[in-house]
Amino acid sequence: EISSLEKACEITDNCFQYILTYIKPGMTERQIADEIEEYYKKRTEGLSFETIVASGENTSKPHAVPTDRKIQENDIITIDMGCKVNGYCSDMTRTFFVGSVPEYIKPVYDLVLKNQVQTLEQMKDGISTRLLTKMVENDFKLNGYDLIHSLGHGVGMEIHEAPYVSYRSDTQ
């Protein structure tokens, strides 16, 4: 089980590395999603869920559907994707930029990154996932933003499995 999960995550990470070299201004979100699907078809049992590729203003939607919006220079892109290996799922989300990071986005990007690093450092046996989420939510509010999604979840044979890292869960 663990080796299948590790393999699925390794392939997904490799797909991210590949797709970063593939994306060019002028491509559509849908073209990128199709390329990800082709990548997985050659290496795995297929997608563990429908790939999300969101760019520009679409990145503000947690579960965006790929559109015909064209990627522009200095665009922000969020990709949420995963595959299945021996029935076990991967699920990774990454946000990056095509070109340079626009100055107006840097504070938000840095806030998210800071909270990701701090949350990973705080994760240990006995800490409540609700508390972890509350810490991030409080920091977002202090900086003028709302937390509009959970922080994460486990994976396995299902794409969403315990532990759930959200204010709705009190897993430790």
Give the label of every model feature segment:
Residues 1-172:
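Active-site neighborhoods and metal-handling regions in enzymes and metal-associated proteins
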